């Protein structure tokens, strides 16, 4: 197999250890067959690698490539008109009566072909790739009928065939109750969400199962019925939970050994402790908090107290978080929620990988996937510090320039 040596760089390996960021000011890295074979101080490079083809990275910063672990980039239409309506004083109910809200996105998504869904998603994905992202989680959930949910997942899978990025799909059939099932959430779960999940799994379209546990969406017992099927199918789970109220969704997710609970603004200490016991990751989504002008913040201090890993993501979606910048999400997590820059970078590398169950991503330790982001900055704190500035020099995927 071809070896590649990357040297003359500042390495932020993001491994656990005594040094913040796993930082090595004069580092080097050897890749082979898509994996990190060796990383460490350049002065300690083993002699066996002396003749390996070398790439001088000009003293730039190298981190693991970024991971956006919670997105809705596949959808039809946009909701810019609602943004304007709200700023002109329209209430949520007035927007909904005018055909807005999730109903608008569901309608636009149901009428879009798979090719159209893919074509509209690719520019969003390109914006993420341009900021050093190598893994993107993509959810369904804007079809809310069997065929459209499948079409969304097929379009998500197709992204990975058109771009050099790893796609992880999440089935989100339990996202909202569609208008044609108004007042019949149980019937929707039984006749649409669960059959769609079984069919999508049979087609190999599902990497994980998600849901939205909230008063405006589904109750814990309804989510549990979907999770029972996910468990029977051997699929990992995650959950939108405690965003607008505390319904106990996080405790439910913990009882199923879920990978993550996402949003969690209203999570209490009992829920945090349940996450810790279950080994879950907390996914922080500052874009939605900002866009919705929320005031209840995620319990960051409690998450630290109970040592629950925190991931950070864009929540890219047409309604509550119309953003694709993971660097901006990092800055927001620091500014709005008081994460440290190191926590923010861990949240888009090591802990984002945990949130997706990807044990081979997120650090630059030997045996990890050699997906690198090379930055024109001197220190990793600069990635979360600057706003509206993209210092990416290049991505290196699988150790290949």
From Swiss-Prot:
Entry's cofactor comment: Binds 1 zinc or iron ion per subunit.
Tell me which residues bind Fe(3+). 70, 72, 240, 315
**Its domain of life?**
Bacteria
Name any GO cellular component annotation: cytoplasm
Indicate which residues the UniProt annotation says bind 4-imidazolone-5-propanoate.
Answer: 79, 142, 175, 243, 320
Q: What GO terms are given for molecular function?
A: imidazolonepropionase activity; iron ion binding; zinc ion binding
Q: Name one GO biological process term.
A: L-histidine catabolic process to glutamate and formate
Entry binding sites for Zn(2+): 70, 72, 240, 315
Keyword annotations from UniProtKB, A to Z = Cytoplasm, Histidine metabolism, Hydrolase, Iron, Metal-binding, Zinc
**In its UniProt entry, what is this protein called?**
Imidazolonepropionase
């Amino acid at each position: 197999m071809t070896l590649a040596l990357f040297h003359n760089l500042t390495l932020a390996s993001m491994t656990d250890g005594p040094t913040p960021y796993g930082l090595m000011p004069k580092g080097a890295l050897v890749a082979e067959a898509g994996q990190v074979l060796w990383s460490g101080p350049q002065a300690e490079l083993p002699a066996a690698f002396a003749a390996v083809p070398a790439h001088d990275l000009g003293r730039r910063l190298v981190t693991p490539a970024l991971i956006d672990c919670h997105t809705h980039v596949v959808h039809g239409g946009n909701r810019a008109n609602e943004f304007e309506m709200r700023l002109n004083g329209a209430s949520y109910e007035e927007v909904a009566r005018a055909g807005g809200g999730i109903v608008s996105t569901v309608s636009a998504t149901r009428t879009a072909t798979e090719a159209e869904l893919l074509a509209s998603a690719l520019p969003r994905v390109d914006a993420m790739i341009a900021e050093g992202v190598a893994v993107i989680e993509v959810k369904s959930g804007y079809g809310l009928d069997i065929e459209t949910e499948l079409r969304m997942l097929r379009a998500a899978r197709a992204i990975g065939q058109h771009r050099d990025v790893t796609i992880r799909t999440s089935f989100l059939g339990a996202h909202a109750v569609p208008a044609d099932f108004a007042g019949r959430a149980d019937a929707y779960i039984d006749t649409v969400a669960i059959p769609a999940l079984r069919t999508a799994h049979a087609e190999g379209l599902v990497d994980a199962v998600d849901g939205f546990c909230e008063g405006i969406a589904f109750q814990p017992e309804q989510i549990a019925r979907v999770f029972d099927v996910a468990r029977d199918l051997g699929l990992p789970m995650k959950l939108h939970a405690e965003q607008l109220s505390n319904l106990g969704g996080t405790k439910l997710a913990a009882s199923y050994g879920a990978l993550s609970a996402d949003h969690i603004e209203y999570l209490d200490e009992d829920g945090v402790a349940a996450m810790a016991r279950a080994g879950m990751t907390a996914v922080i989504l500052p874009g939605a908090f900002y866009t919705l002008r929320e005031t209840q913040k995620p319990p960051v201090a409690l998450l630290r107290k109970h040592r629950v890993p925190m991931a950070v993501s864009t929540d890219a979606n047409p309604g509550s978080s119309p953003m694709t910048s993971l660097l901006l999400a990092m800055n927001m997590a620091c500014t709005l929620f008081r994460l440290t820059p190191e926590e923010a970078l861990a949240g888009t590398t090591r802990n984002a990988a945990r949130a997706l169950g990807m044990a081979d991503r997120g650090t630059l330790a030997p045996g990890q996937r050699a997906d690198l982001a090379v930055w024109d900055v001197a220190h990793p704190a600069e990635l979360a510090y600057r706003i509206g500035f993209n210092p990416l020099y290049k991505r290196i995927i699988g150790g290949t320039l």
